[in-house]
A protein has these predicted regions:
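Short, acidic/polar
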Residues: 36-49, 103-119, 169-173
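Acidic (Asp/Glu)-rich catalytic clusters
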Residues: 73-84, 117-120, 177-178, 200-205
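Beta/alpha (TIM)-barrel catalytic core signal, keyed to glycine-rich beta->alpha loops juxtaposed to Asp/Glu
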Residues: 4, 132-289
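Active-site groove signature of glycoside hydrolases
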Residues: 117-137
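N-terminal binding-site loop/beta-alpha segment at the start of enzyme catalytic domains
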Residues: 1-83
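Active-site mouth loops of central-metabolism enzymes
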Residues: 27-40, 95-106, 135-140
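A short, structured active-site edge motif that brings together acidic residues
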Residues: 82-95
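Short, well-ordered coil/turn segments that N-cap beta-strands
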Residues: 15-20, 53-56, 80-83, 121-125, ...
Length: 289
């Protein structure tokens, strides 16, 4: 299993980032829409993340929309030299807070410029193409050549340093890599949902980061009970155990747990110090059986 202390790093494009980062989605209002309940708390969470050593923040201009990026800029600009801000394009928000695909060339280009403006940047570190085929929940097969080529063109223009993918299949990863190199893949993955095991291993062999989201998503009651029991035996929270398992799963996994609470932020960061024994790992791995 991979080493994972809070000092452990992995490459994300041209940067080495710590494996425990921060996901900014929850800084917006309910349903990731509108302003936060308490803007001061949102600013405090971001500044505390940096003080705890976070140098990888995941965001998007469709969080809010615009709200989360504007909060990041207010809290942290001018940004620390070692901070990697990763954003994503390919979706937009309806007036009812719905999530809608935004895959046309014009929409993709506008999204990059919106991210640049609201983050206060001249160049974006990493932009992921968020794929929303099917019902938008979970990857669905389909060609991404046209939309990914638009992102690759923006990279060639110098607006984006590195590019990646989100919510994709292994076939779509292969299709994209024929067009341009990617530095990361973001998909749902956790102890109970391990459909990307082969993809993670393949990406590790290529030096490409894998960034899982929803570390506690989709657990059955039995799986949740098992995880809670393990956590109690370790004097840890279920989230800490879930994050520690991911860190030990593979060295190319980068985490972006999100929260709007300073207390939960500190708990999440402490997961980097939680070492799971072989016996504990066997119990957790059995949850996927």
């Amino acid at each position: 299993m991979a080493s994972h202390g809070n000092s452990a790093t992995f490459s994300l494009g041209s940067r080495q980032v710590k494996r425990l980062g921060y996901g900014a989605m929850q800084l917006a209002g309910p349903s990731v829409f509108g302003p936060p309940r308490d803007r001061h708390v949102a600013l405090t969470v971001l500044r505390e993340a940096i003080s705890l050593g976070v140098n990888h923040i995941d965001t998007s201009d469709f969080y809010g929309p615009h709200v989360t990026n504007q909060i990041i800029r207010e809290a942290l600009h001018p940004y620390p030299d070692d901070l990697a801000i990763v954003t994503k394009i390919g979706a937009r928000r309806g007036e009812d807070a719905s999530w809608l695909p935004a895959f046309s060339p014009a929409e993709l280009k506008q999204a990059v410029h919106d991210n640049l403006r609201n983050l206060g940047l001249d160049v974006l570190d990493v932009v992921n193409l968020r794929v929303m085929f099917g019902d938008g929940h979970g990857p669905h097969e389909g060609s991404i050549e046209e939309s990914f080529s638009v992102l690759a063109e923006l990279q060639q223009q110098g607006l984006v340093k590195h590019i990646g993918l989100s919510n994709v299949t292994a076939n779509q990863v292969a299709e994209a890599r024929k067009i341009a190199e990617i530095v990361c893949v973001q998909n749902e993955y956790n102890i109970a949902h391990r459909q990307d095991d082969a993809l993670i291993d393949a990406l590790a062999g290529e030096g490409i980061a894998y960034v899982p989201f929803f570390p506690l998503g989709g657990f059955t009651p039995l799986q949740s009970s098992t995880l809670s029991g393990v956590a109690a035996s370790l004097n840890a929270t279920p989230m800490q155990v879930a994050l520690a398992w991911l860190l030990q799963r593979s060295a190319n996994i980068l985490l972006i747990p999100g929260t709007s609470s300073v207390t939960h932020l500190r708990e999440n960061m402490a997961a980097g110090d939680l070492q799971l024994s072989d016996e504990v790992l066997a119990v957790l791995n059995g949850m996927n059986a």
